[in-house]
Amino acid sequence: MGKSTSLLVTALICLPILAPTVAADWGTDTWLSSVIAEERLDIGDEFGCQGFEGVETTDEQWVIAACKEYLEDQTKASRWGKSPISFGIDSKVIDEGIGDALIKSGFQIVGDLVEEAPEGLSIAIRNGASLEKGVADKNLIESAEEDSLVSVHWRARIGDLRVREDKDVISWIEEQPVWFTTWGEWHFHRASGISTSASVDGSTITIESTSQQIGSGAWQVPGTVMVEFEPSVVGVTDAEGLPMPLLTGSERNLAVGWRNVDGGVMVTQNPNTSVYVELEDTTNQIETTPLPTFNDLNYSVTIVGHHTTNLFRWTQDFSGTELVFTWLIERPFNDEVGWKLPLLAMTMLIAVPISIVYLLRADQISASNNQEH
């Protein structure tokens, strides 16, 4: 076989191997920069990351930073902060390399099949089954531990197959006395509550909340504390002397405010703020307790939208719902590339054997002619 023929055969054989690199031409889900995304943020949803469609994050670390950049170019992560902090990985163990890449990109929460992760990453577990019809488990959600976060799995499509949601379970969840939240909101609400302290001077209690988060994209999530004391409350004001919003106890979405509870008050306030509680009488004894769950509700629920490549398709069944979602955004394949890849693969399957046979026959004819001469 001649040198040029050998090179051509090698090139033909390599074509199918090299062809998948076309998939690097990624698409953009423009719904992320539409009114749909804005509405979901207003409801309280969070946008996290899950890498690039068809790419295993554990094998290709570059998708971690790339997914963050892709998401930030389209929308902010939450009403509480710009940068995404939640990352979905379909792996039980996150090694040090992946962990370092996640932390370097600002991610702080991983889930929801993860069982082991390096220090600096919090794990959100899948403990609420799914919203898929036939898989949803009301009893599992109902048996959740007090003050825990229940993560319910949701994926609108698997390939071209549309997944049906369980409308009865959705309606049931909406009726429960639970806090509708997200991975990031739940995580930072706890942290803000822990970093809140209270002091008393005569008949005035000062409640101060500090923030551990810094930077332009950092999340600033309110925290909740219960402050116990004996005297009755005259009023609750912010640092500017304005009355704090009064909560009724029926709110299920995180909001700043306060309400009376047995033996004191429950206050939810923004980080880096001060709240003043004026009492009828003086006191020198108070007790402060951070509350893990907003409004002192039973437990918390978030619906986790996995492999979200098209926000419209993933949200279309939940218009008007009170549920709050943690959307794990995945950058999709370019639609044009989607149909080109199978066509290219089929062409190679047909063309390569035919070309090799043709070239071999051409070599045989050439060798035969040389022998005759």
Indicate residue ranges for each PLM-predicted region.
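C-terminal beta-sandwich/jelly-roll accessory domains of carbohydrate-active enzymes
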Residues: E208-L359
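Boundary/entry segment of secreted carbohydrate-active catalytic domains
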Residues: P20-V55, Q213, F294-Q316, F325-I329, ...
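Well-ordered, non-membrane alpha-helical segments in soluble/globular domains
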Residues: D29-S34, Q61-Y70, G134-K138, L161-W172
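C-terminal domain-boundary segment and adjacent tail
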Residues: L32-V35, I109-V110, W154-S250
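N-terminal membrane-targeting/anchoring modules of bacterial envelope and secretion proteins
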Residues: D73-S78, D100-G106, D168-W172, V225-V227, ...
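Secretory targeting signatures
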Residues: M1-D25, W339-H373
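Metal-dependent polysaccharide deacetylase catalytic core of the NodB/CE4 family, i.e.
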Residues: D25-A129, D147-A156
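Catalytic domains of carbohydrate-active enzymes that cleave complex glycans
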Residues: V114, S143-E145, S151, F180, ...
